[in-house]
């Protein structure tokens, strides 16, 4: 079959980028590393200045945030991963606070312009369609608004469906590469996380639809669901943890109202095993983040369960999930998209689950959030709160009532301190309340 495109080198491709341009880089494990390297080489050679780099969470190297590129690249992430965290905290890079579900809107409505979108796709089929692979998120919107789209054709990119399929006519410049997708190892849950997983699993009914992020706690929850039935998935991301449940027939999606029988997400992150699973799999739909994270779409799924975590929670129920005090650690992400959506679902539950302390024994349940902390989930939004000491429902509870409930699932070492802080805030009635709650 005649080749459907003419490829150039990465070095040739990035020559379309000019000083002052805004460049979007595709996300997570689907970063076009050869284009990133070629762009940085141009910057290092003194050919560019004030080029704006935008992306969501990315894996792998992010050299454009290094001190040598100050004045050359202006970095603005919608979510801060480990590869750019230190630079953001030092002021060498920057962060745009935004709900994950609204990142596409930033491009489509031109709040942020996109001169060039650098993406990675699978080889075209006989009809000329490529796939965005493991991450659609805001990349599709960036493509639609970009003046130029540079695509790396890579045989390791899985062919996924839903909004992931795009025609090669929408791509301006092609580059070929065969670098494997960046795999992400999932840590094994410790005993504390396993206990949290068990408490959360008790809140999940047969026929529920799940959203949960990446990490030890989501994996711990999934490992407790082997006896559940007809679980559905509508989420912003999923990883290897769902594979045993699919194999066992626990995940069917038969109770979903929208996309019945389908696993719906906007990106996938994990090992080669999960990328192989989604490759050519019509049961998986990767959709624009504007769809997956729309609270009013989420709310239509019956028994919608969202499970998210936090860095700190205070006694009023405010959850910080994006910063360590004033230092940005990650980002808003899709937490509030799903907290709001799940709480409006018929039979749904919005869960914030986290250990009561850090691995170093630092208390995560505090009288008030640290100075500069972002209240990602507000005291008005929180419903269920789970630690290794239990699960409490804060919805409809007064400030004093919820303080007592939160203290009840705090680490015993810190309960007296928290009780004293609440007494100081609320007065003698607080202790009366404790005996009558």
Residue ranges of each PLM-predicted region?
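Conserved alpha/beta enzyme-core scaffold
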Residues: 1-437
């Amino acid at each position: 079959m005649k080749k459907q495109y003419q490829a150039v080198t990465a070095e040739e491709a990035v020559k379309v980028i000019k000083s002052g341009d805004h460049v979007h880089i595709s996300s997570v494990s689907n970063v076009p590393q050869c284009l990133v390297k070629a762009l940085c080489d141009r910057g290092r050679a003194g050919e560019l200045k004030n080029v704006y780099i935008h992306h969501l969470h990315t894996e792998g190297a992010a050299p454009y945030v290094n001190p040598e590129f100050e004045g050359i690249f202006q970095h603005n992430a919608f979510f801060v991963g480990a590869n750019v965290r230190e630079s953001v905290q030092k002021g060498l890079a920057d962060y745009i606070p935004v709900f994950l579900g609204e990142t596409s809107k930033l491009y489509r409505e031109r709040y942020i312009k996109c001169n060039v979108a650098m993406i990675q796709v699978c080889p075209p089929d006989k009809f000329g369609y490529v796939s965005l692979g493991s991450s659609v998120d805001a990349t599709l919107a960036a493509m639609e608004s970009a003046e130029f789209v540079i695509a790396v054709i890579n045989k390791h990119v899985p062919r996924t469906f839903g909004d992931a399929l795009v025609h090669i006519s929408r791509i301006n410049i092609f580059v070929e590469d065969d670098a494997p997708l960046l795999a992400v190892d999932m840590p094994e849950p410790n005993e504390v996380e396993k206990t949290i997983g068990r408490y959360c699993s008790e809140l999940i009914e047969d026929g529920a639809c799940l959203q949960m992020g990446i990490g030890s706690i989501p994996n711990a929850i999934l490992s407790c669901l082997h006896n559940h039935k007809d679980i559905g998935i509508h989420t912003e991301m999923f990883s290897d943890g769902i594979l045993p449940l699919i194999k066992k027939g626990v995940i069917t999606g038969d109770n979903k109202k929208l996309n019945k029988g389908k696993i719906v997400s906007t990106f996938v992150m994990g090992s080669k095993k999960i990328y192989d699973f989604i490759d050519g799999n019509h049961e998986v739909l990767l959709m624009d983040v504007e769809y997956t994270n729309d609270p009013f779409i989420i709310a239509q799924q019956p028994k919608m369960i969202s499970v998210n975590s936090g860095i700190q929670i205070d006694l009023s129920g405010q959850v910080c999930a994006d910063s360590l005090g004033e230092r940005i650690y990650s980002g808003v992400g899709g937490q509030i998209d799903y907290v709001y959506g799940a709480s409006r679902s018929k039979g749904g539950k919005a869960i914030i689950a986290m250990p009561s302390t850090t691995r170093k024994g630092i208390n995560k349940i505090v009288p008030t959030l640290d100075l500069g902390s972002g209240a990602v989930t507000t005291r008005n939004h929180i419903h269920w709160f789970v630690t290794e000491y239990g699960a409490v429902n804060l919805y409809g509870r007064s400030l004093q009532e919820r303080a007592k409930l939160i203290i009840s699932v705090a680490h015993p070492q810190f309960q007296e301190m928290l009780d004293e802080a609440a007494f100081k805030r609320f007065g003698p009635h607080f202790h009366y309340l404790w005996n009558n709650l």
